[in-house]
Amino acid sequence: MNDNNVIFDQRSDGLNAFFSKIYALMGAGVLVSALVSWIMITFFLDNMTAILQSGSLFFLVLWIIPLVMVVSLQGLAMKNSKMALPIFIGYAAFMGFLISFTLLMYTATDITLAFVTAAAMFFGLSVYGRFTKRNLSAMGKAFGVAVWGLIIAMFLNFFFASTGLTILISLVGVVIFAGLIAWDNQKITQVYNANNGQVSDGWAISMALSLYLDFINMFLFLLRLFGIAGGNRD
C-alpha cells in the first residue's frame, strides 16, 4: 500500500512538472508576442502606418505564414527536434508582429479589458479542464473541426466586412476556444499517462503551442467584441 502511494506521489509530481513546463513555455510565447507588439507600436509606428496604407490584401497573405509555421512546428515537436523551441519562439515573435497591426485599431482600454478577460477565462477553464472527471475528447475534436469553419467565415468576412457577421464570428470564436482551452488542458494529462510519464520536450512544446494559440485567439476575439461595444471596429 505504501509502495502504491509512493508511485502515485511520483506520478503526480511528474505530471505537475509537465504542466509547469508547458505553462512556462506558453507564458514565454505570450510574453515574446507582447514584447514584439510593444516594440513595433513604440518604435515603428510610422512604418506600420505605411504598411497599412499598402492595402489589406498584404495582411491576408501574411496571415497564411503562421498557418504554415504551425504545421511545421508541430511536426518538429513530435520528432523532438532541437529546432522546435527556437521556431516556437520565432513563431511567437512573428505573431507579435502581426498582432501589433490589429492593436493599432483599438484603444488601450479595449486591449486591457480583452487581455484581463482572456487571462481570467484561461485560468478558470484550465483549472476545469485539468480536474474535471468528464471526458472532453468529443467536445475537443468537434471544436477542432469547427475552427476550420471559423477560418472560412473569417476569410469571407474579410471581403464583406460585415459588423454583424464580425460579432457572430467573434462570439462563436470565444465559445470554440473556451472549449479548446479546457480540452487541451485535459489532453496534457492524457498525453502524460499514455506515455507513462516519459514525455519529451517536444511534447511540452506541442502542448504549449496549442495553449498559446487558444489564448491568443481568445484574446483577439474578445478584443473585437470589446472594440465594437466601444465604438471601434476593424
From Swiss-Prot:
Membrane topology: Multi-pass membrane protein
Regions that span the bilayer: 25-45, 57-77, 85-105, 108-128, 142-162, 163-183, 203-223
UniProt keyword Membrane, yes or no: yes
CDD domains the record matches: BI-1-like_bacterial
Alphabetized InterPro entries for the sequence: Bax_inhibitor_1-related
Chief site of localization: membrane
Keyword Magnesium: no
Pfam families: Bax1-I
Cellular component GO terms, alphabetical: plasma membrane
Compartmental location: Cell membrane
Keyword annotations: Cell membrane, Membrane, Transmembrane, Transmembrane helix
Database matches in PANTHER family: BAX INHIBITOR-RELATED (PTHR23291), PROTEIN LIFEGUARD 4 (PTHR23291:SF50)
Name of the molecule in the record: Uncharacterized protein YrjE
Organism, as annotated: Lactococcus lactis subsp. lactis (strain IL1403)
